[in-house]
């Protein structure tokens, strides 16, 4: 399974991936900046990015358990889609610069961006810990399935269902890890964001 993600893209392909990720971060930051009341929320986002990057790197020995999915979901809920997209792309690129960067980085950025957007669009319903935890668990599966699409570059669509089924134990680990991180982070992160009076856009 791991070999399916080890795609040789060459220098030009890697440049295209890096430009795509940079464009994603730039677009999200520029769009979000238009409604920026002050600079404090950017400091908060930078701190969350650092936490997400180091959380992912340090928890690498635990298969598919990391705080990033929950962080991006909660930023989507409390700060909006644009800021969650920026956070998702920065964490994906920043952590993969340490762990290994390639085509999968783009899929991770897209998967976490989708999680953040879902958090933003469902924000009015994600107002209790059980709902946030349930959404976080489901987002573990969603993120992993988006990442699985990267095998289409090497194995083709006929292998995708088998690949997803083979990955279900790892998806379950991701979902369980997300339950833990949601219980740990949901309330404190909401309090921190509210203290900075961030307006959802």
Protein language model regions, located:
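Central hydrophobic cores of alpha-helical transmembrane segments
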Residues: 48, 84-95, 131-141
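Small-residue-rich segments of transmembrane alpha-helices in multi-pass membrane proteins
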Residues: 45-51, 76-78, 139-146
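Membrane-embedded alpha-helical hairpins and interfacial helices in multi-pass inner-membrane proteins
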Residues: 1-19, 105-109, 121, 125-201
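Alpha-helical transmembrane segments of multi-pass membrane proteins
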Residues: 69, 73, 109-116, 179, ...
């Amino acid at each position: 399974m791991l070999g399916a993600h080890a795609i040789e893209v060459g220098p030009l392909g890697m440049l295209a991936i890096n430009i795509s990720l940079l464009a994603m971060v730039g677009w999200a930051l520029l769009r979000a900046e238009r409604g920026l009341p002050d600079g404090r929320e950017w400091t908060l986002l930078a701190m969350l990015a650092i936490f997400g990057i180091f959380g992912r790197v340090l928890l690498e020995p635990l298969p598919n358990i990391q705080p990033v999915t929950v962080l991006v979901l909660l930023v989507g809920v409390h700060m909006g889609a644009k800021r969650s997209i920026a956070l998702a792309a920065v964490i994906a690129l920043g952590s993969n610069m340490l762990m290994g960067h390639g085509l999968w980085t783009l899929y991770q950025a897209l998967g976490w961006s989708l999680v953040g957007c879902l958090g933003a669009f469902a924000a009015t319903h994600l107002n209790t810990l059980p709902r946030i935890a349930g959404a976080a668990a489901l987002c573990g599966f969603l993120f992993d399935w988006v990442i699985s699409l990267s095998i289409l570059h090497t194995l083709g669509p006929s292998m995708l269902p088998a690949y997803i089924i083979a990955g279900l134990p790892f998806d379950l680990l991701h979902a369980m890890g997300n339950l833990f991180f949601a219980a740990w982070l949901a309330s404190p992160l909401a309090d921190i964001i509210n203290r900075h009076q961030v307006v959802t856009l």
